[in-house]
Every structure is written in structure tokens, then in C-alpha cells.
Amino acid sequence: SRCTHLENRDFVTGTQGTTRVTLVLELGGCVTITAEGKPSVDVWLDAIYQESPAKTREYCLHAKLSETKVAARCPTMGPAVLTEEHQIGTVCKRDQSDRGWGNHCGLFGKGSIVACVKAACEAKKKATGYVYDANKIVYTVKVEPHTGDYVAANETHKGRKTTTFTVSSEKTILTLGEYGDVSLLCRVASGVNLAQTIILELDKTAEHLPTAWQVHRDWFNDLALPWKHDGNPHWNNAERLVEFGVPHAVKMDVYNLGDQTGVLLKALAGVPVAHIEGNKYHLKSGHVTCEVGLENLKMKGLTYTMCDKSKFTWKRTPTDSGHDTVVMEVTFSGSKPCRIPVRAVAHGSPDVNVAMLITPNPTIENDGGGFIEMQLPPGDNIIYVGELSHQWFQTGSSIGRVFQTTRKGIERLTVIGEHAWDFGSAGGFFSSIGKAVHTVLGGAFNSIFGGVGFLPKLLMGVALAWLGLNTRNPTMSMSFLLAGGLVLAMTLGVGA
């Protein structure tokens, strides 16, 4: 699965009868949805971008100077005059120079002098700013079912589906082939203040240098370089890259301050680099909050017969995925298709299956299958696939796992924010409370009661509530009632 290869992975586990779950998707992360009676699905935010954003200013990094002219007058003869002084695209400077008999003046004193030079910009020496439009930013979300096929990190799963969302998008339904349909309704949010963000792009001159950065609008507007708007042929403040020398009689030198690319690159050290792909300008941060409908998903292979247990061999022995799960792959030499008999037992409990399958109902197909992912309790375990067995020690602790999943649930609810609550009606408010409980405690509940059936969990919740009603100690009574209520809510709830 896609999520197996990513470091930032989250699990959202639906309880019995779950039809909808709420996810928080962020760039670089991946969420695996598991629910009883449903295929597991990976969902991730693949990209945030805008096509062809609008240009704002262009800055010149290296001036191109030409047609230098100088005019001078003797003392008392009035100001020097050049017609170019009032032409657009020309940089001029007025000053006073020492005049006398040695340079063709009858009087000694200060005379007027003016120098002008035509200023343009060297080719491939521009820095251009682009602005985002929140209404045109596209969020690409991808969905992939767990089919039991191993897919390398650099390969694309044949069942992968892609959809896009904008601020005006509505619900999308994706067809996952034999696994049914999944619906997505996503609310988008960029991780940056778009009104204050500029993409600064340099003309491409060297392959080893980055070409674009995500900068603040105020910093961009304060750059001390010549600038112009798109389509304007003349540069404003061109004098910023021109220096005039000290005047001598009828002469004034003009100097080009040279290429400012290195100065700009030094100023951009540590600034987030922007990614540009063709005409797509990507954002580096942001998230979407998606409500995923699971009601039309269906498990594949439930009618298959069980595989012959003696005809399995390891293709990839059990390995730690890095996400508190175990992954493995087997090959099968018997008749296909069929269901893979897989289970795991803990030390001292040989009759209790402790494996929580992330790949539900693993199968061998005519053209693939055999990849299995599962979660095991901390400690010594033995994994069985048919007659194959493998001893496995799962690191960590049950308490630590509960705290970790609860922390992730709180983070998820915090990101969802105000969208998690419906104050429009009493029913909506209580539904929001149920959803919040599922979001925060769903993972912890599954860690504790993952191997317990629906009826035992229901009876446990009822028993705790009954103890709470019949206990005279107020503290004990409230504790039992709260615990019983949570167990019943997590057992009977249909949304996470």
C-alpha cells in the first residue's frame, strides 16, 4: 500500500457499522482507514498547486547600459541640457564640475554638468513574482484500496484513483473497481497566508541552483532593485543598478553595479524553496479535512475457498513497517483464487488470534495477491500463514500505544476545528459530540478492544453502566457510568 512507504502515517479505525469517517490529510502524510467488514483504504493529499498564477512585479538583477551622453556648461552659462534627460528608460544625474581656462571657459568656478545613460535589463537576469488566488488553488487527493499486491515506493498501484478539490468543490464519488465506491467531501485550507505570500522565480541559468522561493509580500516589495509590471517595457528605479562617478570638467563616468543574483541568493538562504512543475506552482503546506463515505465499499473474495495451507512459501518474511505494524508477502503454488489463512498468537495464549489485519481478508488472485499487513500486541508473538510460522517480537507497550493513538486523535480534532461541531440543532450537537469522541478515542479503543467481538463489548458497556447506577459512592458511580458510556458509544457508533 502507499502508506506503508511513508514515514508520516496515521490510522483511522471505524467501529462496528461505521459508514463515515472524518480525516485530516496533510502534504507528505497518508491515512489508512480500517473498518469491520470493509476493505482497508489509503487516502492521502498528493499536491496543492495553482496553474499559471498571475504575475506581479518583475525585478532586474543585472542592468544593461548603453548610449551614455554628457553635457556641460561654463560658469554663469546656465544649466546643461540633454534631451534624453526627460525620456523614459534613461537614467540621468546632474552635478557641478570645476571649470576654467584649462577646459575652455573664460571664468573660473562651478559649471553645470549632466550625464545620461539608457538602462535596460540583461537577458535571463530577471526575478518574477507570482501571486496565488485562493479560489484557483487545486488540492489533489488520491485513494488506493489494499488489494494484497505488493507495490514498490516508486511504482503506481493499478487501483489508485485521483480526484481534485477547490474551495467550490462538492462531494466526489470514486469507483474502486471490485471494491465498490467511496465518497469524499473535502474542505480545503492552505497552510500559508496567501494574501501575504509571493512566489519569487528566477530565470533558469544553472541546473544546480533552485529557481523559486516562497517569500513574504512585504519583503518582496521592499527589494532595492529596478522593477516593472508585466507588459511594461521600461524599468522603474533603474538608477538602483547605476553609479555615476565624480565629475571632472566635461566628463562624468557611468558604472554598472553588475549582477545582483548572488546578493539575492544570499538573502534567500533559509527561505522555503517553491516547487514549479510546468505551469503548476506548488504550495509546500496545507491540509484538507475530508468526510469519507464507506457505505458502498465491499469486501472482495468473501466467496473464495480457503487456500491449501501446505502450499505457501515466504516471498518476504515478516518485517517491521515502521508504523507499529508488520508486513509480509507469500507465494502460493495451489489452485487460485483463494483466501489466505492468517493468524497470530501471543506467548501463553495459543488459542487466541491476536492479529488485527490491516489487509482485511487477504487473498491470492490469479494475477497477484499475497501481501499482508497486520498489527500485533507488544511482546512475543507467532505469525501463522497456512502452515508457515514466524516468531515475532513486537516492541513497545499497550499503554504507550493507547497514549499515542489518543494524542493523534486530539491533534486530528484540533485541526478539524469548528467544522467538527454542529450547533444548529440538538441532534446535530449530540452527533458532533459522538464524532469528537470517535476522533479522539477511536484508536485507543481499538488498541484495547481490537480482538473483542461486538456482543462482548456491548455486554461490557451495559455492565459498567449498571455498576455505575447501583454504586453508592458518587465518585465510583460516575467513573463506572463514564466508562460504560464510552464503551457503548464506541461500540454502537456509526461515525468516526
Swiss-Prot record:
GO terms for biological process: clathrin-dependent endocytosis of virus by host cell; fusion of virus membrane with host endosome membrane; symbiont-mediated suppression of host innate immune response; virion attachment to host cell. Pfam families: Flavi_E_stem, Flavi_glycop_C, Flavi_glycoprot. InterPro entries: Flav_gly_cen_dom_subdom1 (IPR013755), Flavi_E_Ig-like (IPR027287), Flavi_E_Stem/Anchor_dom (IPR026470), Flavi_E_Stem/Anchor_dom_sf (IPR038345), Flavi_Glycoprot_E_cen/dimer (IPR011998), Flavivir/Alphavir_Ig-like_sf (IPR000336), Glycoprot_cen/dimer_sf (IPR036253), Glycoprot_E_dimer_dom (IPR038055). GO terms for cellular component: host cell endoplasmic reticulum membrane; membrane; viral envelope; virion membrane. GO terms for molecular function: protein dimerization activity. Residues 1-447 are extracellular. SUPFAM superfamilies: E set domains, Viral glycoprotein, central and dimerisation domains. Keywords: Clathrin-mediated endocytosis of virus by host, Cleavage on pair of basic residues, Disulfide bond, Fusion of virus membrane with host endosomal membrane, Fusion of virus membrane with host membrane, Glycoprotein, Host endoplasmic reticulum, Host membrane, Host-virus interaction, Inhibition of host innate immune response by virus, Membrane, Suppressor of RNA silencing, Transmembrane, Transmembrane helix, Viral attachment to host cell, Viral envelope protein, Viral immunoevasion, Viral penetration into host cytoplasm, Virion, Virus endocytosis by host, Virus entry into host cell, Zinc. The chain crosses the membrane at residues 448-468, 480-496. It comes from the Viruses. Disulfide bonds join 3-30, 60-116, 60-121, 74-105, 92-116, 92-121, 186-290, 307-338. The keyword DNA repair does not apply. Residues 469-479 are cytoplasmic. Glycans are attached at residue 154. Residues 98-111 are annotated as: Fusion peptide. CDD domains: Flavi_E_C. This is Genome polyprotein.
